[in-house]
Curated annotation (Swiss-Prot):
Involved in cytoplasm to vacuole transport (Cvt), pexophagy, mitophagy and nucleophagy. Recruits mitochondria for their selective degradation via autophagy (mitophagy) during starvation. Works as scaffold proteins that recruit ATG proteins to the pre-autophagosome (PAS), the site of vesicle/autophagosome formation. Required for the Cvt vesicles completion. Involved in glucose-induced micropexophagy. One of its GO terms (cellular component) is phagophore assembly site membrane. GO terms for molecular function: molecular adaptor activity; protein kinase binding. Residues 557-585 are annotated as: Disordered. It comes from Komagataella pastoris. This is Autophagy-related protein 11. The keyword Cytoplasm does not apply. Its main location: membrane.
Length: 1313
């Protein structure tokens, strides 16, 4: 890109060149460059590539250097510098046959112009020219060489051949350079075809890398599928879901209701059967897919890699193409060729012209001068040097370079043929196999694994139902608890409002009484009425009653309005928001479906109890455990019901984590219980079944705090004193001492520490749940692939094979865990303690944060009153307590880490030992499998060989018997034929003996007729000689006519030529007449000496090749007529049947074509003449106008006759005196300088050194009293001042310097009009 053209700074231009992107054609190896910033979209980029390589945009497939599919974002971000272009038409997966392959190669290499630069013969390689040059060399030694001794046409031909030879050499060198045969890359000379071969191989390496990426994606998907299957098999409930179901049968709720009745056992059995079938199906598909991957993908990928390496060695490591000596020799060859061509061009420029070769010694003499003879000798010497030395070297070097170019091109085409016929088909085949396998994994296998996972999720409800049902109970209990908390808060609010109303009413009564007593004028009981306003009892009551709002909080749940201290039960709206029995849900899903419902609580406790009483365990399952029944039953749940459910879980040995989680939920609700160490008696944590609803009740306190905080306004903050609340609730428990203040940085440290402990607890819990699934690669699948298909009938057996290696590792882990069960239990106890401590710390942290806010506000209000020392002491004490707690937690954390590290090290060591043992077994099994496979392949090959040998021997035996039978039959037929022929011959012999006499008589008659025929043949021979001579004359005249016609046509700029391919029925025999520009200028003069009609001199001067072709057919006419009959027959049969017919076709002139061509040419000439005549007339008019315009302008230099000149008088007095003294002499030389009427000379105003002085003959111009004269020059006479006469007035009238030139000008004054 030209930076100046686009207005770019040189630095910007260099940056653009650095950001250029190379685009390579993967089949042809052609490279183009582009700037990424020139493209606004991906489609525009593809259009550019399509226009550059001739590939449709829909057929483009683009890759980057490492086989990554090109994206437009890569181009815009400058992340890619190389793009490889693939044509989808050649990568369709179908193997090309020979015809299609040849067509494809022809279309790919149609841009190769190698045939156009093939070296042609030199113009000097002509036998006639060589003979003439030899003749010239001999005659130049003559003393008096005459022009009559030279053939001027041939001499001109020699001169022209030398000049055309220089053009031939220069064109040859230019063609080789234009093909970019060599170019410098990193200071190394490389062949373009080698670079193209490298590009082709690198492009297909990128395609192989793309295939490898596809395989890695397939490998990842396959491994994920295997891992998913193994994980599902490890965690599957397929074998032990019934044990969990039996546990559910022992878990009861409210004493009579069994938890297993919520599940459909028959549906669970169907799901388990479906899972078993799916597991076997997935296992079989993975096994078959592994076999297909090994046979169709992995082995072929190895083969493709080997094939690519072989192509690199074959086409890149070619000794003749890539050796350094070859590169240096080629460079030397090109330099040597350049030197020889420059020498030929230089010699051609120094050649004499034809006139210099034909210069005579005198005017009328024909003898050549010595200089001409010398130049002829130089011409002969140059011709011999070129023809014998330089031209053969140029031909040899150019042929060498051309052959190397052809060799490299053939190597490239061979690579293209190999790729298109075999390599590309194999690469695309592997890609198709990868796509099929990927689709199988993503569609079929993924769907089956998803179904299997979904079935496992269905069966997991058997294991998770105790926790799910417990959470459902906790959620409902929380709603009941919240309703009670809300009722209490509402009741307290009503009391407060009523109290405020009572206080206001009492205050009004007191105030109105006092007001009436202190103002007697308004008291109606005091004497006379002064004011119109008098206060009586009715008015007092009205004053107290007016504007006293009656407020009451009424809880509305549906259509029921409970009293403030009403029942603690809840009620439900008559119509639920959702359908209680969705048809697509089973019993447990119905339960889970109702988790998100919103219920309205009311006074339906009695109705619920009736429902519970009416449904006994003996009732049918569908009626007893309907959705509405369970919802109504759970509405009546109490804390004791929840604890009985937990006790039932413990009795049936349900997982301790489930129990701990449920107990934690109760604790969060403030419904936790404590156990006495003596007899484990259950004690309620407060009055009532759902909590004490006092300061010890966390949920109640949270709701109360939120309620009170909502009454805060600007500049008003509400502080909650827990001891005050406890006193109001009548609770006499001791106040728990709380820290007054907590440092902010210390709280942040606690938060970070708690998060770290939570992370450690989570990791330990994961470790206790078992080792993570092992990411099994291909070797395990190879192991179970070798087993017979008979062992794959059931899913259990298939699963055992697929998990062979992993099962042993898992068994070892289980054994190790059983050995360390004591340590794990101790660790678990420590973890539970730490978890409880962490929970307690979290709660304390929340309380501390709230207390901090409260105390901070108190400190702000009491800042002026409080003592600073007491505040600091309180902060220090709180900080000290927190530090003690932090040290205890750190100590516990260190103990936990040490136990965890010891346990991890022991487990890790045992697993590594087991893995090493398994690896050795795998290697051993793999080696055994390989040996058995090799032995099997060897036996198969041997069996195939002997089977083939047997089949070939049987076939040969059968063919031999058939041939013997056929030959025996032939022999019998031939014998019968020979016997019959012998009998026929005997009959013929007898007949011939009878005919012998007749033949003797016929012979005598034949001899007499033969004598007569000889005389006739002599007469016929003379006639043939005469006809042959006349025929030769006609042919020569015909040939002359053809030459004349070609000369006439070329004289008018037309060239007659013949098409190489023409139809047989073409009347003109393929002859065409074309107009050729510049042909007339090359046409030699027709007045030169004419050559013989059948000679080659005239033919060489013609541009038409038809005359030369016709002349080749006239060779046999130069011979004398043959005399012998055999020779005559040969001439008649061969010459006249072939050459003569060809000659007649070549010399036949189509009259219509000739007349039309000449007529059209003359019409064109006439039209051109008219056009030129118009242009000439227009130019003449313009010239006349310009002449008139020029004639009216004053000339100031280079004067000539007819110019209009301005004359001015001179001011040199010496010139005037000289003119006065020499006036007499001047008058005497009137031819040189005319007389003057005044002694003052006048000179023309001019620019330049020459002096132009006015010569006024006989006062032709009146100069008296005039300052200037405008006159037109009539004549000028040049004078020069010599050194001898510059001091004489006559020789130097104007007193000029020696050697000065001056002009005497005669002019006529220009007048107006």
């Amino acid at each position: 890109m030209d930076s100046s053209r686009h207005g770019l700074h040189p630095l910007q231009n260099s940056l653009l060149h650095q950001s250029q992107m190379d685009i390579y054609n993967s089949i042809t190896g052609i490279r183009i460059s582009a700037i990424p910033y020139n493209f606004n979209s991906y489609d525009q980029f593809k259009q550019y590539i399509s226009a550059s390589f001739g590939i449709a945009p829909a057929d483009l497939f683009l890759l980057t250097a490492f086989g990554i599919k090109l994206k437009f974002s890569m181009i815009m971000n400058g992340d890619v510098r190389e793009v490889y272009v693939f044509d989808r038409r050649f990568y369709d997966g179908q193997q090309m046959v020979d015809d299609k392959l040849d067509t494809a190669l022809e279309s790919l290499n149609q841009c190769e112009m190698l045939n156009m630069i093939k070296p042609m013969r030199s113009p000097l390689e002509n036998a006639d020219i060589l003979r003439f040059v030899s003749y010239l060399k001999d005659i130049t030694n003559r003393p008096n060489l005459s022009t009559e001794d030279l053939d001027l046409n041939k001499l001109r031909l020699v001169l022209n051949s030398l000049k055309r030879s220089s053009g031939w050499a220069a064109a040859l060198l230019s063609d080789l350079k234009k093909t970019n045969y060599y170019k410098k890359v990193n200071e190394e000379v490389l062949c373009d075809n080698k670079k193209e071969i490298e590009i082709i191989l690198i492009s297909h390496n990128a395609l192989i890398q793309y295939t490898n990426l596809m395989f890695k994606t397939l490998e990842k998907s396959f491994n994920e599928s295997v891992d998913s299957l193994i994980m599902l098999q490890e965690q599957s409930l397929l074998e032990n879901w019934k044990s969990y179901y039996q546990i559910l049968k022992g878990v009861r709720f409210k004493g009579n209701y069994v938890l297993s009745d919520l599940l459909d056992e028959k549906m669970l059995e169907n799901v388990a059967a479906d899972s078993k079938a799916l597991m076997g199906n997935v296992n079989d598909k993975l096994t078959r897919l592994r076999s297909r991957i090994d046979s169709e993908i992995i082995s072929k990928r190895v083969m493709i890699n080997d094939l690519y390496e072989s192509l690199k060695k074959k086409y890149l490591d070619v000794p003749n193409l890539n050796s350094n000596s070859r590169t240096e020799n080629d460079s030397d060859t090109l330099n040597r060729l350049t030197e020889l061509v420059n020498q030929v061009v230089k010699d051609s420029k120094e050649l004499p012209i034809l006139d210099e070769l034909l210069t005579t010694s005198g005017g009328n003499s024909t003898t050549l001068s010595a200089e001409s003879v010398k130049k002829i000798n130089v011409l002969v010497s140059v011709f011999e040097t070129h023809s014998s030395t330089i031209i053969p070297q140029i031909t040899e070097l150019s042929n060498k370079l051309y052959d190397e170019k052809v060799e490299a091109l053939n190597l490239k085409q061979d690579l293209q043929r190999t790729l298109l016929s075999d390599t590309i088909h194999k690469i695309v085949g592997v890609q198709l196999s990868i796509l099929k396998a990927t689709n199988l994994i993503n569609n079929d296998l993924s769907k089956n694994i998803s179904n299997l996972d979904f079935n496992e999720l269905k069966m997991s409800i058997v294991k998770d139902l105790p926790l799910v049902f417990g959470l459902w109970l906790a959620g409902n209990l929380k709603k009941l608890k919240w309703l009670e908390n809300f009722n209490k808060v509402a009741f307290k609010a009503n009391e407060i409002l009523e109290m405020l109303k009572f206080i206001e009413s009492n205050y009004r009564s007191k105030w109105i009484d006092g007001f009436s007593k202190t103002n007697p004028c308004v008291n109606s009981n005091q004497g006379q009425r002064i004011l119109a306003l008098q206060i009586n009892e009715d008015l007092k009551q009205q004053f107290v009653r007016d504007h006293l709002a009656s407020s009451r909080i009424v809880l509305k749940t549906g259509s029921n309005v409970p009293t403030p201290g009403g029942s603690k039960g809840n009620s439900r709206a008559p119509t639920p928001e959702h359908d209680p029995h969705p048809p697509h849900l089973n019993a447990i899903n119905k339960l889970l479906h109702n988790f998100n419902k919103d219920y309205n609580f009311g006074n339906l406790r009695q109705a619920s109890e009736e429902v519970v009483r009416t449904h006994s365990p003996a009732t049918k399952r569908d009626d007893r455990f309907g959705n509405q029944f369970w919802l109504t039953l759970i509405d009546n749940i109490t804390t004791e019901d929840f604890y009985h459910y937990i006790d039932s879980l413990k009795e049936n040995k349900v997982n301790i984590k489930v129990i701990k989680q449920l107990e934690k939920n109760l604790t969060d609700l403030g419904l936790g219980r404590i156990y006495e160490t003596s007899n484990d008696k259950v004690i309620s944590a407060g009055g009532g079944t759902i909590g004490p609803l006092n300061s010890q009740d966390t949920s109640y306190m949270n709701l109360l705090k939120k309620f009170l905080k909502n009454f805060e306004i600007n500049d008003v903050t509400i502080q909650i004193n827990i001891s005050t609340l406890e006193t109001e609730n009548g609770n006499n428990n001791e106040k728990e001492k709380e820290p007054s203040f907590s440092n902010h940085e210390l709280l942040q440290g606690y938060q970070r520490r708690v998060k770290k402990l939570e992370s450690l607890l989570y990791q330990q819990s994961l470790h206790q749940s078992g080792p993570p699934p092992i990411n099994m690669a291909y070797p395990p699948i190879r192991d179970y692939q070798q087993r017979s298909s008979a062992n794959l009938m059931t899913s259990a057996t298939a699963t055992e094979m697929l998990m062979d290696t992993h099962a042993r590792i898992h068994d070892t882990d289980m054994k190790q865990k059983r050995e360390n069960v004591d340590e794990i239990q101790v660790l678990q106890t420590r973890i539970e303690q730490l978890q409880a401590n962490l929970e307690q710390t979290s709660k304390e942290r929340d309380d501390e944060r709230e207390q901090k806010e409260i105390l901070h506000l108190k400190l702000m209000k009491r800042d002026e009153e409080g003592d600073e020392d007491e505040k600091i002491n309180g902060l220090v004490a709180a900080n000290h307590q927190l530090q003690i707690r932090l040290e205890a937690l750190q100590k516990q954390n260190q103990e936990l880490q040490s136990l965890q590290e010891r346990n991890n090290n022991e487990i890790h060591a045992s697993q590594e030992r087991e893995i090493e043992a398994l690896k050795k077994q795998v290697v051993q099994l793999t080696e055994e499998k390989t040996q058995m496979s090799d032995e099997k392949d060897r036996l198969d090959l041997s069996n195939e060989h002997w089977k083939t040998q047997y089949e070939e021997a049987a076939m040969m035996k059968k063919d031999l018997l058939d041939n013997m039978t056929a030959q025996e039959q032939e022999y019998k037929n031939e014998l019968n034929t020979h016997i019959k022929e012998v009998e026929d011959l005997k009959v013929k012999v007898e007949n011939l003996e009878d005919e012998e006499a007749n033949l003797i008589e016929i012979k005598e008659n034949y001899e007499s007729k033969l004598a007569q025929n000889e005389s006739h043949f002599e007469e016929l021979e003379s006639i043939i000689k005469s006809l042959y001579g006349k025929l030769r004359l006609v042919i020569e005249r015909t040939f002359q006519n053809v030459v004349t016609v070609c000369l006439m046509l070329e004289a008018i700029g037309l060239l007659m030529k013949r098409d190489e391919q023409y139809e047989e029925n073409d009347p003109s025999n393929g002859i065409r007449i074309h107009r050729v520009k510049g042909l007339r200028s090359r046409r030699r003069s027709t007045t030169s000496k004419a050559a013989s009609p059948l000679g080659n001199d005239e033919i060489l001067e013609l541009s038409s090749q038809i005359v030369a072709e016709a002349d080749k057919q006239l060779v046999y006419f130069h011979q004398e007529p043959v005399k012998e009959l055999e020779s005559l027959e040969t001439v008649l049969d061969f010459k006249f049947n072939q050459d003569f017919d060809k000659f007649t076709r070549l010399t036949y002139m189509d009259q219509k074509l000739l007349v039309e061509s000449v007529t059209k040419r003359f019409k064109d000439v006439e039209q051109l003449a008219r056009k030129l005549q118009k242009e000439s007339n227009y130019s003449k008019t313009e010239i006349d106008g310009l002449i008139k315009e020029v004639n009216t302008r004053i000339s100031i230099k280079d004067f000539k006759v007819g110019d209009l000149v301005l004359f001015l008088p001179t001011r040199d007095d010496t010139i005037n005196m000289n003119m006065a003294n020499t006036v007499e002499a001047v008058n005497r030389r009137a031819s040189t300088v005319a007389s003057f009427e005044t002694y003052q000379p006048w000179a023309a105003f001019n620019v330049g050194a020459p002096h132009y002085f006015l010569i006024n003959d006989v006062s032709k111009i009146d100069l008296n009293g005039r300052d200037w004269v405008l006159a037109r020059i009539e004549s000028m006479e040049e004078h020069k001042v010599t050194r001898e006469g510059h001091r004489r007035n006559v020789g130097n009238p104007y007193n000029l310097n020696p050697d000065a030139v001056w002009y005497g000008v005669r002019a006529k004054e220009e007048t107006v009009g």
